[in-house]
């Protein structure tokens, strides 16, 4: 199953190279869950998460390209298996976990 990610077309306007690489990674992995991390008002970088063996490897590979002081930002995501929206609380928990994991390892 391919990636199921819903975003506004305005999110793609003005994307820098890092953001585009993150988006490309999302499609390559066929992830069913996406997490949007951004720094302030800058464009969001897509982190592809399969919640499986590739979860940490893919996440950290893209998190490393984000600037310090990044902030989590919730966009529109869909869970491919349930076919519904992922609860915002779950996204915040996952996003916060990756945030602290990044700063504890690096």
Swiss-Prot record:
Q: Which residues cross the membrane?
A: 43-63, 86-106
Keywords, in A-Z order: Membrane, Transmembrane, Transmembrane helix
The terms describing its cellular component in GO are: membrane
Predominant location category: membrane
Keyword Membrane recorded = yes
- Provide the topology term for how it sits in the membrane: Multi-pass membrane protein
Q: Where in the cell is it found?
A: Membrane
The miscellaneous comment for this protein is: Partially overlaps AST1.
Stated name of the protein? Putative uncharacterized protein YBL070C
- Source organism: Saccharomyces cerevisiae (strain ATCC 204508 / S288c)
Q: What is the lineage of its organism?
A: Eukaryota, Fungi, Dikarya, Ascomycota, Saccharomycotina
């Amino acid at each position: 199953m391919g990636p199921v990610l819903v975003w506004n077309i305005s999110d793609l306007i003005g994307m820098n190279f890092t953001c585009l690489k993150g988006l490309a990674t999302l499609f390559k992995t066929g992830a069913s869950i996406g997490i949007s991390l951004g720094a302030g008002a800058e464009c969001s970088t897509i982190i592809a998460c399969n919640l499986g063996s590739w979860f940490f490897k893919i996440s950290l590979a893209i998190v490393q390209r984000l600037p310090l002081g990044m902030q989590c930002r919730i966009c529109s995501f869909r869970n491919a298996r349930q076919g519904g929206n992922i609860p915002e609380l779950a996204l915040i928990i996952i996003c916060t976990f990756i945030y602290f994991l990044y700063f504890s390892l690096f």
